[in-house]
């Protein structure tokens, strides 16, 4: 969702959290067979042998930190599976609802997994004494070979952006520089199916999710803590923006609304500190 007319680099001190209701990954589920559960038990070892397609960021894992401690292990296993584009089912000791919470958190924390949008299929089982378990098979928007082939373009976009920050000395200057670079090099379009950062970086176009994930990725690469916020904008339309740390405080930044168009369709850049 993009607001027409003036909009914002919203640098508003964060006083409330970001809700994730209505944003849980979708998938199918059925009762587990013994063979399926056995296959899921061996998936972790299989995935550990594979290289990551992109370096996994650990600068800011805000959504993971909101999970109960017992679910963070489930998150970590699904995290590694997504990082290596693992296609085998993974068994976790969690209910279906808990798995979906972990996948939502994973989607928020890791913009670098541009091949994964939180989708998965599920096989559930409930064993007396042992409790609930779920076999999870992640699904991807592209195959591993395609994702790997796009990494040089991601690296080139990052370099081009960071080259413009040569004079930036403070985190604020870096935040503003990345914000302005994305706006100057991206066209907002509604017909983009891909909601990751890859369309912004390779085709220079995207929706609010693409803007926000690109900003988040670049902040994390600079070592600046940043997370993704998902909610609604004007008109109750779904919207994505960022929350970034600067000078010890957390602020909201909306790159999409900082890249407005007026009623004539003319582009522009907007800065609004509130």
Regions found by a protein language model. Give the residues of each.
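Sec-dependent signal peptide recognition
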Residues: 2-8
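Hydrophobic core
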Residues: 9-17, 219
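N-terminal accessory/pre-domain segments preceding catalytic cores
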Residues: 13, 19-169
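Alpha-helix capping and helix-loop boundary segments enriched in small/acidic/polar residues
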Residues: 62, 78, 202-206, 230
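Conserved active-site-adjacent core of cysteine acyl-enzyme catalytic domains
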Residues: 145, 193-202, 206, 210-217
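Secondary-structure boundary elements
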Residues: 146-200
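Catalytic cysteine-centered active-site loop
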Residues: 192-198, 205, 226-236
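Hydrophobic/aromatic-rich core segments of domains that either
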Residues: 210-274
